[in-house]
């Protein structure tokens, strides 16, 4: 993951490759059905949280910041000990952590299942094991960290539904695990796409995800 900070070294090559790469990422998004099992929309405004891991948290964070009903998204680490929740240590792949995002949302505006629809369809590829795109290691694994039994049931049922329908060419490898802790990442990781929209890594890997969200799920998309 550290190489992302030195991506500018390859700018000359990437300028040539960007158009092709972006097209490839855009084409990789998958249209999927709504979850058959989901929580009904709440009758009153409120605040709930979802913690999801889908590769580098920069792009996942940016996607959910553009989802209606979401009020805040923070990048962080989940799955390991709070004592090892530092970027350099997580990057070794030896801490048990996954780069994750904590999504704060209003359950009267969007359901947990609809958040998972965004997660599976445009935020990442749930069939890649311990990697996403150019990033490899267990810290880039696909995971859903549930905070209650309802979230667990919805996540497991949706994965089973999508696998049974063979929506993807390969089986979903997303882990469903109880949330032990969410450890917020360092300040420079927050709103990374907003602060570095022209960085080659962002242009190639993450901006196409926002376009996929806008085109494939227009009813859930919001401009910022």
Where are these regions (language model features)?
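Flexible coil/turn and secondary-structure edge motifs
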Residues: 2-7, 12-224
